[in-house]
Amino acid sequence: MKFLILALCVAAAMAGPSGDQIAAAKASWNTVKNNQVDILYAVFKANPDIQTAFSQFAGKDLDSIKGTPDFSKHAGRVVGLFSEVMDLLGNDANTPTILAKAKDFGKSHKSRASPAQLDNFRKSLVVYLKGATKWDSAVESSWAPVLDFVFSTLKNEL
């Protein structure tokens, strides 16, 4: 069964976004990737259930924790993982590393994250990107397959 899942992930990677799509998404991402706190804030603001999944933030006022070192550190980890995957995209030799990162994510999040929460995270990320980057139909058509690949790879490990 594990082999089948791995084979499907590799097949998804091979059928993933084109080089041009990856390049356009990376260029867009590079303009906001250092806004880690703002990105996580936007995700939590739109999805309080995701915030409550993190015990250190559950039940706390989002605006009051946004500027704290704990929030900043956690935003760095969450958005940092996405940035690492974005950096690895575009080189087929990096596929095993991407899959390993997804597997690590799955191990650490299996008990507290759901595919639905990842879908909501993705939607909130897109809303953030639309407001914080130059977003047009070309950028959107580049991001869609990149996000499909990244989030399906992560969800496969939950």
Curated annotation (Swiss-Prot):
Superkingdom assignment? Eukaryota
The answer to whether the entry has keyword Protein transport is no
Checking Gene3D superfamilies in the record gives: Globins
Q: Which InterPro entries match?
A: Erythrocruorin, Globin, Globin-like_sf, Globin/Proto, Mb-like_M
What GO molecular function terms would the record report? heme binding; metal ion binding; oxygen binding; oxygen carrier activity
Provide one Gene Ontology cellular component: extracellular region
> Where is heme b annotated to bind?
74, 109
Provide the Globin domain boundaries: 16-158
Give a single Pfam family match. Answer: Globin
> Could you tell me the keywords of this UniProt record?
Heme, Iron, Metal-binding, Oxygen transport, Signal, Transport
Q: Extract the signal peptide range.
A: 1-15
| Binding partners and assembly | Monomer.
Q: What else is known?
A: There are at least 12 different components in Midge globin.
Q: Which family does it belong to?
A: Belongs to the globin family.
Name recorded for this polypeptide: Globin CTT-I/CTT-IA
Q: What species does this protein belong to?
A: Chironomus thummi thummi
Q: What is the lineage of its organism?
A: Eukaryota, Metazoa, Ecdysozoa, Arthropoda, Hexapoda
Q: Which gene encodes it?
A: CTT-1
